[in-house]
A protein has these predicted regions:
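Bacterial Sec-dependent N-terminal signal peptides
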Residues: 1-25
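Short, low-complexity N-terminal intrinsically disordered segments enriched in polar/charged residues
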Residues: 18-43, 47-48, 131-133, 138-180, ...
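C-terminal functional regions that serve as terminal interaction/effector modules
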Residues: 21, 25, 183, 189, ...
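Short, structured motif recognition centered on aromatic/hydrophobic residues
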Residues: 33, 95-98, 119-122, 130, ...
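Short, well-ordered alpha-helical segments enriched in acidic and aromatic residues
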Residues: 39-60, 180-199
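Short beta-strand edge/turn micro-motifs at domain boundaries
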Residues: 115-151, 251-273
């Protein structure tokens, strides 16, 4: 009898782990994150859902978000958001979510004081919990169009046999190409299925919108890589750091997707305009 209950307990544990290892559970984690912000506070939401090594951006610099929010006081206002797109690796333990956010001074009945789009990268930690590794957003003044949630499931890739490039190498190569070629560098590195989140603009989701945003970029931006991480199967990953232009200093985030012809930029988040 004891053996039977031990086996039953093991089955239940395995079932829970596999239930959490899915795009639906990652999306639910994002929704729970947003719900906690609304019901409790933004501070409590970030402390609860961020990985202890998770990154947020403060005054253009990437910092440890767990330490920042643990030590900070509650901030006034109400921050709301919801995912409209989610993508996950084939191992179902690493992915990202994105969608609109709004900030209200007192109540949700008021007009929002600010709005924009967020990007959050998630992973399953050793306890089988979804925690976010990095969170970054942009703001804009345009009206947000409600979009139905879209989930991108993993696609089987037929990589070239000699493909050995790491995500770090891809990021470094793009930055070097940008130094020498400027905006033309995007033609070799940007995925045909990509999102550009630039401050002051709605996310660019189609070729025409992406070209318009890239053309709007100022020349001479200097990137410094501070960190990067890829999924266990090296299918998704991200690189982040700072970007400088004259006296302006901001953070940046790129999410990379490994496609049939190598690493391609799936999402780029910039605050320069």
């Amino acid at each position: 009898m004891r053996k039977y209950f031990s086996l039953l307990a093991l089955v239940l544990i395995v079932s829970v782990v596999f239930a959490q290892r899915s795009i639906d559970s990652m999306v639910q984690a994002e929704k729970n994150f947003a719900s906690t912000s609304l019901v409790a506070s933004t501070k409590e939401a970030f402390v609860k859902f961020i990985d202890t090594a998770g990154i947020v951006f403060e005054k253009g610099n990437p910092v440890n978000g767990f330490e920042l929010y643990t030590k900070s006081d509650r901030r006034p206002g109400i921050l709301t958001w919801e995912p409209e797109y989610a993508e996950i690796s084939s191992s179902n333990d690493f992915g990202f979510t994105t969608g609109p956010w709004k900030y209200y001074a007192n109540t949700l009945k008021d007009d929002p004081l600010a709005k924009g789009h967020f990007i959050t990268v998630w992973h399953l930690n050793n306890n089988g919990e979804w925690k976010f590794l990095i969170d970054f957003g942009i703001n804009y003044n345009m009206e947000q169009k409600k979009m139905a949630l879209k989930k991108a499931k993993p696609e089987k890739k037929t990589l070239k046999k000699d493909f050995q490039q790491s995500l770090k190498e891809a990021e470094e190569k793009f930055i070097q190409s940008y130094k020498t070629q400027g905006k033309k560098a995007y033609s070799s590195f940007l995925s045909s299925n990509s999102r550009l989140n630039y401050a002051g603009y709605l996310p660019a989701l189609n070729p025409g919108a992406r070209k318009a945003l890239i053309d709007s970029l100022p020349a001479g931006m200097g990137y410094i890589i501070i960190g990067f991480k890829s999924s266990p199967q090296n299918e998704l990953g991200y690189a982040y750091g700072t970007v400088d232009l004259n006296d302006k200093h901001e953070g940046y985030l790129r999410i990379w997707r490994r496609e049939n012809d190598g690493w391609k930029i799936a999402v780029e988040v910039l605050h320069f305009k």
